[in-house]
Amino acid sequence: ANAMATEQGFYALAAVWRRREGKNALFQLSDAPENKDAVSGAGKTAIGLPGKNAAVTPNAIKYPGRTFADIASHPSRRHIEALAARGVINGKSELLFDPESGVTRAEFCAMAVRALGLQLTGAQSSVFTDVTDADWFAPYVRTAYAFGLVNGVSEAEFAPNGSITREQAAVMTARAAGLCGLDTSLSESGVRDALSVFTDYRQVSGYAKNAMAFCLSNGIFDIQTAALVPQELETRAELADGLFGLLNLADLL
């Protein structure tokens, strides 16, 4: 009995580790049947928060063990692998992820829509003149726009190939958090407390302050440097970190 208890204890510890890593469950330790999804961890099925938009759904693990040669020693490796396993993010090729390259507005739409498990909006007259049905990203842009995740750079243009900055990523991520049922509002003092620990907090644009503070105070963004550099371009690795943090907070992993 003691040996069995010890063995189950080790399995439980392993399951907790896999849950933290964003991986699926290890074993079912109970004899009782349980309806579980492939995104479950340690006997727990990810179902999202009670107040989430009904269209937001967890992603099952589709590609277990997916990784890339250029992230082996990268600090964002486990987040990238967890999202890649769910089909949320792809590499630049089968072997390379290119973690330090920038993210376009179209790429953000694709990753965010997949992360939230949103059904793609069908072909229709585009809101933006620079997004056509022939573009691979068109359904993702339409869907992200329909759910309020993104806006155009003008009433007519979306600028799909434009890069996004760290503060722009914060705004879009906070909008996604709202869809997930999270309260993204902060008091003025809450915003100040979250931002003022960084030396360049005054450089955060007014429109992005609440969103940036929300992402920081909830651990969605884990910035370990003294400066926020909010105008710096968001990297693919940083976006993976942010999406993983959001999904974990929203009980979607």
Model-identified regions with their sequence ranges:
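Preference for long, well-ordered alpha-helical segments
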Residues: 239-240
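An alpha-helical repeat/solenoid feature that recognizes helix-turn-helix modules
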Residues: 1-21, 110, 163, 171, ...
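A short amphipathic alpha-helical interaction element
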Residues: 80-83, 109-112, 144, 213-215
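Feature responds to low-complexity, polar/acidic, surface-exposed segments characteristic
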Residues: 28-77, 90-109, 113-140, 147-167, ...
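Extracellularly exposed regions in secreted/surface proteins, prominently low-complexity, repeat-rich
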Residues: 15-30, 34
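Hydrophobic alpha-helical segments
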Residues: 12, 16-19, 218, 246-249
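C-terminal, surface-exposed recognition/capping segments
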Residues: 207-213, 217
